[in-house]
Amino acid sequence: MASASVGDDVLGDDPTVIELQNRLARMLDKQAALFVPSGTMSNTVAIKAQTRHGDEIVAHKKSHIYLYESGGYAALAGCSISLVEGPWGQMSAEGVQNAIRKSEGSDSHYPDCNLVCVENTANVGGGTIYDQQTLDEICEVSRLNDCRVHLDGARMFNAAVGSGTDPARMVRDFDTVSVCLSKGLGAPVGSVLVGDYETISESHRWRKMLGGGMRQSGILAAAGLYAMENNIERLSEDHSRARRLAESISEMTNFSVDLGSVQSNMVYVDCLEVGAKEMRDRLAKRGIDVLDETDSVIRAVVHLHITESDVDRAIGAFEASQYSASVQ
């Protein structure tokens, strides 16, 4: 990062940012890409660039766009949202079809749905991975209804590695894709939005308006390039460790884990007997950090800094914490 070649990305002449954008665009077989500070901004500018004020978008009821982006689709893009239910945080083509509303034929009672948003992997679903056939069917249904399709691919490389699918094939039918560099890939900051020239050009305008234009951002893009070159293949190690952690916790008396949902690097643990906040605090005393997702469910995430011995330590901490808050 310290030795990165830099320019001014607001003016479009930072060579390291350009290299990162071009690499992602080529890898995903899209025309162009845009480096942004965060995944939330990437999703926001993608929605804004592909909708009009008063339109509607479709997303899963447990999607990051709906739950964890401060309602940006409404406040910033002026869109309502039609929510789809489905197991493990995933939508079906039928669910998407039923959620799409159009103004035409409704005596102008309905808004126009012009964008369908899919999340892969599905975070709150447990880090689950969509079948490629389902992705293809959702894109087809969207096209038949004159809707564009956006992939919130914050962890799409986890999905690609976990399913053995070529990344470009996975996103072939999506108009835009948001890729996060700072999750499983391990870069300190940044996401990249990829798509066609026109949409990325419009997204560039909204990035500027939202304060996402950065000057010598090549120092950040350099970390993203390193992550792309070195940290994709190794994601399978995180998946394997998450699976071992999940299987061990599932055998403990006071915890419940849906092993079917453990498909990437996340483990959602139901600790109803203790409560999520209490369990979070008990584990923290033993040096294990987790998030409390609901009153009873915590989330543990395995990343590139977690070793096999760390997993062993986490298993021991869960075992001890299910009965007592004290640290021996």
Report each predicted region and the residues it spans.
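Conserved PLP-enzyme active-site core in the AAT-like
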Residues: M1-A4, D8-E273, K277-R286, V290-I306, ...
